[in-house]
Swiss-Prot record:
Membrane spanning residue stretches: none
Active site: 64
Function: Involved in the regulation of the intracellular balance of NAD and NADP, and is a key enzyme in the biosynthesis of NADP. Catalyzes specifically the phosphorylation on 2'-hydroxyl of the adenosine moiety of NAD to yield NADP.
Localization annotation: Cytoplasm
Name of the protein this chain belongs to: NAD kinase
GO terms, biological process: NAD metabolic process; NADP biosynthetic process
One GO CC term, this protein: cytoplasm
One GO MF term: metal ion binding
The keyword tRNA processing is annotated on this UniProt entry: no
Catalysed reactions, semicolon-separated: NAD(+) + ATP = ADP + NADP(+) + H(+)
Pfam name, any one: NAD_kinase_C
Length: 292
């Protein structure tokens, strides 16, 4: 998917002076090249404005947390996102603050190449009524409260009982989110082009429940079983809802996903190596040996 860079909407991390200053520099840079640009400080409580909905690209200035927050607001808009990293890890926000002019020059000259990403929709049903729902770009996590107690969950796929789980929690992650909380809990790395999602238990107790990958077309069901524990569901590590025994959490692939701008010279595998997810003891960047 290829697009021309004509209009840019810039979203900055909240209360971040460096992001605001960089956004002003970017606006001037784009204006000098005949590219329309507008700026907004990230506001999670509101929808993206009309300018963003008609933009060629949404630039996000911040870390991966800001990138996730803006990504949820952009699900289904058909407008690609590109992050400029002002945080620590920067797996989602790929462009460095020092290298933005070089990256954007190439995009202005060559246009945008976009990749599609899957998002998750989840809903909490209580006594047959939906009491909470949301969208996640990275993950939906069920976890315990302030006390160090395992939580009791009943799991199912497409209406078929899978098994019960006693654990500190459970992570349902998209391919995009596979490099986040899920990989720390022993979950699989999943290429972002795949239309699947992963289920990863957090410290399962006396249970041989291994991480698994489900097709995006499947429905994953989590029943909160009786127990003394507090249980919460959190989307992308940013919004939380308290659950009760008997609640049913249903997770499916969202009807529409989102788009990310592909950065020239940055592949999924180069990012895995650069961020330490994959180690290369023989020397970074060596070619794969040719088959004989």
């Amino acid at each position: 998917m290829h697009r021309e860079l004509k209009r840019v909407f810039i979203v900055t991390k909240q209360a971040h002076a460096g992001a605001a200053a960089l956004a002003a520099d970017m606006q001037a840079w784009f204006a000098a090249r005949g590219i329309e640009a507008a700026t907004e400080e990230n506001d999670t409580a509101s929808a993206l404005p009309d300018f963003a909905r008609s933009a060629s690209c949404i630039m996000v200035l911040g870390g991966d947390g800001t990138m996730l927050s803006v990504s949820r607001r952009a699900v289904g808009l058909d407008v690609p996102l590109l992050g400029v990293n002002l945080g620590k890890v920067g797996f989602l926000a790929e462009v460095s603050a020092a290298g933005w002019q070089q990256a954007f020059t190439r995009l202005a000259e060559n246009g945008l190449t976009c990749s599609e990403r899957l998002a998750l929709h989840f809903a909490v049903s209580r006594e047959g009524r939906c009491v909470f729902e949301g969208t996640a770009v990275n993950d939906v996590v069920l976890h315990r409260g302030v006390l160090a107690r395992v939580i009791n969950l009943g799991l199912g796929v497409d209406g078929e009982w899978l098994g019960d789980l006693r654990a500190d929690g459970l992570i349902v992650s998209t391919p995009t989110g596979a490099t986040g909380y899920a990989v720390s809990a022993g979950g699989p790395l999943v290429h972002p082009d795949m239309s699947v999602y992963a289920i990863t238990p957090i410290c399962p107790f006396l249970n041989n429940f291994h991480p698994m990958v489900l097709a995006g077309s499947m429905r994953f069901e989590i029943r909160i079983l009786e127990g003394p524990q507090e249980v919460y569901v959190t989307q992308d590590g940013q919004e939380c809802f308290a659950l009760q025994a008997g609640d049913l959490v249903t997770v499916t692939q969202a009807s529409r996903g989102l788009l990310f701008v592909a950065v020239e010279g940055s592949t999924y595998f180069t990012r895995l190596r650069a961020k330490g997810f994959v180690r290369d003891p023989r020397g970074r960047g060596r070619a794969v040996p040719a088959s004989s």
